[in-house]
Amino acid sequence: MTTVPEPSAELLQRAGAVRLAAVDLGQTDDQQRADALQAMADALAERAEVIVAANREDLERSAAEGLAPALMARLKLDAGKLRGAIDGVRKLASLPDPLGRRQLHRELDQGLVLERISVPLGVVGVIFEARPDAVVQIASLAIRSGNGAMLKGGSEARCTNEAVMEALKLGLGRSAVAPDALTLLTTRQESLALLRLDGLVDLIIPRGSNELVRFIQDNTRIPVLGHADGICHLYVDAAADVDQAVRIAIDSKTQYPAACNAIETLLVHASIAPAFLASAVPAFQAAGVTLRGDEHSRQHGISDAATDEDWRTEYLDMILAVRVVPSMDAALEHIRRHGSRHTEAIATTDDQAAERFLGAVDSAGVYLNCSTRFADGFRYGFGAEVGISTQTLPPRGPVGLDGLVTYRYRLRGDGHIAADFADGTRSFTHTDLPL
């Protein structure tokens, strides 16, 4: 059984430094934080060759160790992917300030005015997979939202993560934000000890399996924002446009199969299965996708048999489970039983069927006639995401800047005391004022 160690003196010192830097960061203005992100982007561009070389080292070592192809795809950070990450930082810098937004403005009595204002969380701890571009996304989201961050990436990406973090800190050193606002955890012991840093860390965001999320929730007093498996479904309804549904299915599986928002199971209504699968099966085969079907779908060109395990497997690869269902009820029941509450989609031209599906599926994202690959903070216009939350409580779905802030009530008075309201000397007006 894995035990959670006490944090070392060195880790406590680093966490304390992040906490102090986060306090100062929370006092910076919008322009200072935007400038800090531009400086981070500049430093990443300057150190691009070093970062890409470090990534090649990680790739070579991981290939020799037999890392799965899906994880190798996530691990890769070439020059083009790095440029995209840098562009994302610059775009994030240009987004509206998430801090200082007045969400409520109410007069309680003459001269007694209540406000609710958005403020940073403080310090976030993020444990994520072997995806080094996630370091860039998470760090930039944290700084833009006024939060310090302690980051622990997959060990497969350790060289890349260290090179990226060095560049990010170099950029912060040229800005009004202290480099201590970010720190990188590099060992398993440190990531476990992070769970005991309540009082220094305000939120933990694990990006990984259900088992990882459950372990963290069971072993920390720090609030946890759960991001678990991405077992996403596309349901092809009886009234689907076949050509459109095939395009959506192909994109949802093949555009980036290692992503958590790629579909892992395709559900097809029995009445449209012959026509749909006649087009879809050759298209998937041409794209290099291995299909595993139930008994009914195997009557339409799928040779490999699916097992019960396939319905609950996140392949992150060019493998797709296919099931023919007799009704939408059966599709909804399958999703309830096997889904991970991430993202589900329906392809249909029937408005009534569409509204029923959109209302009945309890996932963070429910889509009509479009690819599940849109479940992404950048594509939602959030700039980037720190993760995708599959829990019911907010924030839910892709967590961007707005998911990394909380709020504070500010009350301004002029000698007001509660006793005057208790004895009837004064009375509340409760008048909403302009935001």
From Swiss-Prot:
GO BP, sorted A to Z: L-proline biosynthetic process
GO MF annotations in UniProt: glutamate-5-semialdehyde dehydrogenase activity; NADP binding
Keyword Cell inner membrane listed: no
Signal sequence residues: none
Reactions this protein catalyses: L-glutamate 5-semialdehyde + phosphate + NADP(+) = L-glutamyl 5-phosphate + NADPH + H(+)
Compartments where found: Cytoplasm
CDD domains: ALDH_F18-19_ProA-GPR (cd07079)
Pathway(s): Amino-acid biosynthesis; L-proline biosynthesis; L-glutamate 5-semialdehyde from L-glutamate: step 2/2
Cellular component terms (Gene Ontology): cytoplasm
EC top class named in words: oxidoreductase
Alphabetized Gene3D superfamilies for the sequence: Aldehyde Dehydrogenase, Chain A, domain 1, Aldehyde Dehydrogenase, Chain A, domain 2
Family according to the record: Belongs to the gamma-glutamyl phosphate reductase family.
Name of protein: Gamma-glutamyl phosphate reductase
